[in-house]
C-alpha cells in the first residue's frame, strides 16, 4: 500500500465557486480526505498575463492550452476591473470543505504573493499572512493550523515570517520528504511537507500527453522513494479535467495507492533542512526547494 498526501490548491473565484464543490463530491464518493488550501482575498490572477513576455511562461500557457484549461474569466480576472473577493463570497463552500477535509491558507491575494512577496520585507509578509488567516478563520469558525505558499514562492524569509503564527505545518516548497527547516536562531522551525510530484500544467505537452498522464503519474508515485505528495488545482481537476481526476482515483485504488491529508504524513522525528530558491522544470520563475541540512 502506497500512501500519498493529496493537496488541493484553490487560486481563484471560479475555482472556489465551481471547482471545489465538484471535488468535494468526487472525494466523498471515493471516501478520500485531502488538504485544501484556499485563497480568500481578491482574485487578481489575470494580472499574470504580463508574464507572457517571458518565453518560459508563454510556452507553458501554449502547451497546456490555458484558455480552455482555465477559462477566460480566470485569465482576465482583476485586469480591467478590481478582482472579486473570494472568501466571504464563497463562505458556505469553504465551510462545507472544512467539515470533511483539512483546510488551510493558500494566500490572501494569490497574484500579489506570487508576483511580489519575494521583495517584501518581513513585516509586510507577516501582515499579509495574518490578513489571510484572519479571514479564513472568520469563515470556518475555527483556528487555521496549516498553510501552503502560493506558487511555492518561499524562502528563508517566508519560513521566518510564518513562525509568528505557530501553525502545525506548512507546505511551502518542493522536495522529497517532510522536514523541519532551520531558523536563523539555529532552532528547528515549523514542519514543512513538500510537494514531491509534478502538477498537471508542469508536464502536459512537455513530458506527457493528456491521455497518458494518469499512467505516467502513477508510475512516478510508485517509484517515489520519499514521501509522495501530489497537488491538484480546483481550476483544473475540479473543472475542465474532473473526469481525468476521477479516472486517476480509480486507477490508483487498483494499484494500491491511497490518498490522505498532508498532516497524516507527519512524524515525531523529522530531518532538518532549509528552504532555498530553486527551479522546477515546467514552471516559470523561482520557487522554494527543500535542501537537507549539510547538503549544498
Curated annotation (Swiss-Prot):
Residues 2-260 form the NodB homology domain. GO terms for molecular function: hydrolase activity, acting on carbon-nitrogen (but not peptide) bonds, in linear amides. One of its GO terms (biological process) is response to antibiotic. It catalyses: 4-deoxy-4-formamido-alpha-L-arabinopyranosyl di-trans,octa-cis-undecaprenyl phosphate + H2O = 4-amino-4-deoxy-alpha-L-arabinopyranosyl di-trans,octa-cis-undecaprenyl phosphate + formate. The keyword Iron-sulfur does not apply. Pfam families: Polysacc_deac_1 (PF01522). One of its GO terms (cellular component) is membrane. It is an enzyme of class 3 (hydrolase). Its EC number is 3.5.1.n3. The keyword Lipid biosynthesis applies. Pathway: Glycolipid biosynthesis; 4-amino-4-deoxy-alpha-L-arabinose undecaprenyl phosphate biosynthesis; 4-amino-4-deoxy-alpha-L-arabinose undecaprenyl phosphate from UDP-4-deoxy-4-formamido-beta-L-arabinose and undecaprenyl phosphate: step 2/2; Bacterial outer membrane biogenesis; lipopolysaccharide biosynthesis. It comes from the Bacteria. Keywords: Antibiotic resistance, Hydrolase, Lipid A biosynthesis, Lipid biosynthesis, Lipid metabolism, Lipopolysaccharide biosynthesis. Catalyzes the deformylation of 4-deoxy-4-formamido-L-arabinose-phosphoundecaprenol to 4-amino-4-deoxy-L-arabinose-phosphoundecaprenol. The modified arabinose is attached to lipid A and is required for resistance to polymyxin and cationic antimicrobial peptides. Belongs to the polysaccharide deacetylase family. ArnD deformylase subfamily. This is Probable 4-deoxy-4-formamido-L-arabinose-phosphoundecaprenol deformylase ArnD. It comes from Shigella boydii serotype 18 (strain CDC 3083-94 / BS512). The gene is arnD.
